[in-house]
Amino acid sequence: PDSYDAPDPRIKQLARRSTVTPGGAACRYNDIIPADHCLHDVQDMSTLNHPRADLSKGQYGCVGQGLHIAKKLLPYIPNNAGILLVPCCRGGSAFTQGAEGTFSESTGASQDSARWGVGKPLYQDLISRTKAALQKNPKNVLLAVCWMQGEFDMSAATHAQQPALFTAMLTQFRADLSVFNAQCHGGSAADVPWICGDTTYYWKNTYATQYDTVYGGYKNRESEGVYFVPFMTDGNGVNTATNAPAEDPDIPASGYYGAASRTNGNQVSSNRPTHFSSWARRSIIPDRLATAILNAAGRTSAFISGKAPEIKPSPGGNTPSGPSADTSVRTISLLPAAGEAAAQGWSIKDGGIQLSDGVFKITKQSNKTWS
């Protein structure tokens, strides 16, 4: 956290665990909290500490790519905007095998949830947390979904079902999110790109035919808003580093300790080449995912200008809003269902009322009551 994995105050995440960091400040499910290298995913990776980690410096758990994707996107968004990550990952999950687990509105999917599909606990977790993120603030916009899944479908006899099950879930996700179309990239949930990442060379070498079916199912679907991102090799054709000790060695002279010094008690899997290294998750993986997001969603005036989406409420309705850090000052925005506020006779009466861009705002001042 004090070097490669340093957080940024403009990058937040939706909470899942009971504390922001192990032993840290308390938080509740779906609170907005700082994002770091080990996000609040379905599977809690915060206890798999590297044997050389200094926990007093926050060097806990495993390194994921989420924070690093966001950090690479920051230079491309307006300075007054931030990024809210919605962690919903579950390692070893599949569409065609695995335990379904359970889902709760107050805690999300259980850690043993390992089955994707329409209506499954993992899907309920994904859609409910996405909606929660958008409800936090009407200016929040769903930019993209990063999707890295397929390994455990390849090892199933029913692997050929994965592409159709994925497509069905994608279709349902977009339908369920259509109520938030105004807060989605392009003005529609159907326009939000799904950025589908590749896997390690181990999986392709072991399951060549299955790889072509599962990961091939993500390819050539740009017209559907599905974008495949290759990770298997770098720009020179060299295999992207995994957790194999030779590919992520310790470099004591530099103070870097990789997967080589992890053991069965603190590593993701004893089958080392099945997972990308933490170094890859800081570099080539977020580089390519961020680039894919920018190519799919970044070349729009709304993205470049940071213009908030227009929310069209029904008469008498409220626009969604998130909790305010300062409860002594609250703002309610009322938008006319049709026409302009000024044309309807609204005017400024005192300093607590503002009329800006056709939006009439009344701000509650500290130690004052509504009247």
Q: What feature does the model see in each segment?
A:
Residues 1-316:
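Cell-envelope and extracellular/periplasmic
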Residues 319-371:
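Extracellular glycan-recognition regions
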